[in-house]
A protein has these predicted regions:
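Ferredoxin-reductase
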Residues: 2-98, 173-174
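A general structural signal for well-ordered alpha-helical segments in protein cores
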Residues: 21, 46-49, 66, 134, ...
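Active-site donor-binding loop signature of nucleotide-sugar glycosyltransferases
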Residues: 40, 206, 287
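Short, charged beta-turn/beta-strand-edge "cap" motif at the junction between a beta-strand
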Residues: 57-61, 104-109, 278
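FNR/FR-type flavoprotein reductase catalytic core
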Residues: 89-261
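Local cysteine-cluster metal-coordination motifs and their immediate loop/turn environment
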Residues: 236-237, 259-290
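A charged, well-structured terminal subsegment
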Residues: 293-299
């Protein structure tokens, strides 16, 4: 895609033309983050890992903010938001009945089938605010697993030996307050267990005030095994360390939702451009935010 092409102009117009006006249903703190639930008329179902552009109806900010879709039930969409700047602070301060401009869902998400249809185990690795996309991913994995493996033997992929999917969720936080952001994910994990997934959640807290001082990478080193399929989201240094661990094991595939600043959200401004391992450029908002680990970090 070249700068100044008609495609970039059309993408920018699409973002402005397809804004939806949502109404805040609930906004509750979860540690250092806010769980914002919005009713969005016209919302199209999101893939896990996709995001939306959000802007408070009365915002003083020029640009909307890119926020991962954390969960959805029809037009009721939940977001986990960290107040890191003026725009996100405005979103975290909204009350029931306030209005929000929404564009989305946008981007490319996780490959649910690759995580579910596998001889290995599914592993979710999240650091800090990187927990945000995983409630929806876990819910969709449970739904897809039921659809595939609740059929009689011979009518679909898998069989008796694939009737239970093991999912290991590894979470890392600076302290116990930040760890409260995992509340929604834990709720979804409990429901996933009831639906037939064998789901286990482990949490590493770095400050060591309520147990051993550990990072999420310590948990991954302890538990990762050959054949695992891994979904990752977190700060770049954590993602790089996770990839190094994954690359050290045979037959491990990992998908990374990259944390990077976005402006337009539709690929027209090239503000989130990254260079991939093969030397080509990619727009995180359009070509991602989810990429295979080897594409980003190299083989």
């Amino acid at each position: 895609l070249k700068d100044g092409s008609n495609d970039t102009i059309e993408e920018a117009h699409w973002a402005s033309d397809y804004r939806m006006l949502g109404s805040v249903l609930n906004n509750e703190p979860q540690g250092l983050m806010a769980r914002l639930e919005v009713e969005v008329p016209g919302w199209r179902s999101a893939e896990p890992g996709q995001f939306a552009l959000l802007q408070a109806g009365s915002s003083r900010c020029f640009l909307a903010r890119a926020v991962s879709v954390a969960d959805e039930v029809g037009a009721r969409v939940s977001f986990l938001i960290a107040p890191v700047g003026e725009g996100t602070r405005e979103l975290c301060a909204l009350n029931g009945g306030d209005m929000v401009w929404v564009v989305g869902p946008l981007g490319r998400g996780f490959d649910v089938d690759a995580l579910v249809i596998s001889r290995g185990r599914a592993v979710i690795v999240a650091g800090g605010a990187g927990v945000a996309p995983f409630p929806l991913l876990l819910a969709r994995m449970a739904r897809r697993h039921r659809a595939l493996f609740s059929r009689p033997v011979g009518e679909g992929p898998g069989g008796p030996q694939a009737s239970t999917l093991e999912v290991l969720v590894l979470l890392g936080f600076r302290d116990a307050l930040q760890a409260e952001a995992s509340t929604l994910l834990r709720e979804v994990a409990a429901l996933a267990c009831e639906s037939g997934l064998r789901c286990r959640v482990e949490v590493a807290i770095e400050d060591g005030l309520r147990g051993p001082a550990e990072k999420v990478t310590d948990l991954l080193i302890r538990h990762l095994r050959s054949g695992d399929r891994v979904a990752v989201c977190g700060p770049t240094p954590m993602a790089e360390a996770v990839w190094s661990i994954c690359a050290s094991k045979p037959d491990v595939r990992a998908w990374f939702s990259l944390e990077t600043g976005m402006a337009c959200g539709v690929g027209s401004c090239h503000g989130c451009l990254i260079t991939l391992a093969d030397g080509s450029d990619a727009r995180v908002c359009k070509d991602g935010p989810v990429f295979l680990g080897e594409a980003v970090f190299g083989g």
